[in-house]
Amino acid sequence: ISVYRFSANGAVAAISCRGGYPVYMRKTGKMGDFILEYRQALDKAKRYLEKIGLAGFKETYYFTDEGVCVINFAYLDGRTVCYTDLVKVGVAMDSGEIMLLETSGYLSNHTDRAFESPAVTIEKAAEKVNKKLKIRNMELTLIPTDSGGEVRCYEFLCETEDEQEILIYINAVTGEEERILILLKSDGGTLVK
């Protein structure tokens, strides 16, 4: 994405040359004591996205580092969570100020998609999940492929016998397993491996 870069008052920003969309913004500064809870930071991030014209997103994962809670949002296309179309928003946990915005995933990948009904039902896809795992949640998703494309999958949030959470992605067209991710939870948030 070609951008115009700006900097002032401890912040840097980039606006796309085509369309004038915000591509990224980062502010620096010393963070004070945490006064916000995650839900408050999430609310501020959602309101910020709406303010800049980015609506229709679902929060996915977050982590807090050096006083900033960075929340990942995926575009919601009908009932499909599009992980390919990601936006990140960072909220200062001491003041609620927006410290980070990254939209390049969304700007690079978002397009109007005409999703057809999945060839494989969610029940058939669930049969592919190992029976030793407890399925806690299921939803339709669009995930990136290693080759730069995208594939529509059912996402199964599962739990192992030792309470480790994992995500299993089953292709909604072929019924084959596409990917397995491990959820890494800590006091600072949740990341995937």
Residue spans of the language-model regions?
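Long, terminal "pre-/pro-" and other extracytoplasmic accessory regions
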Residues: 1-193
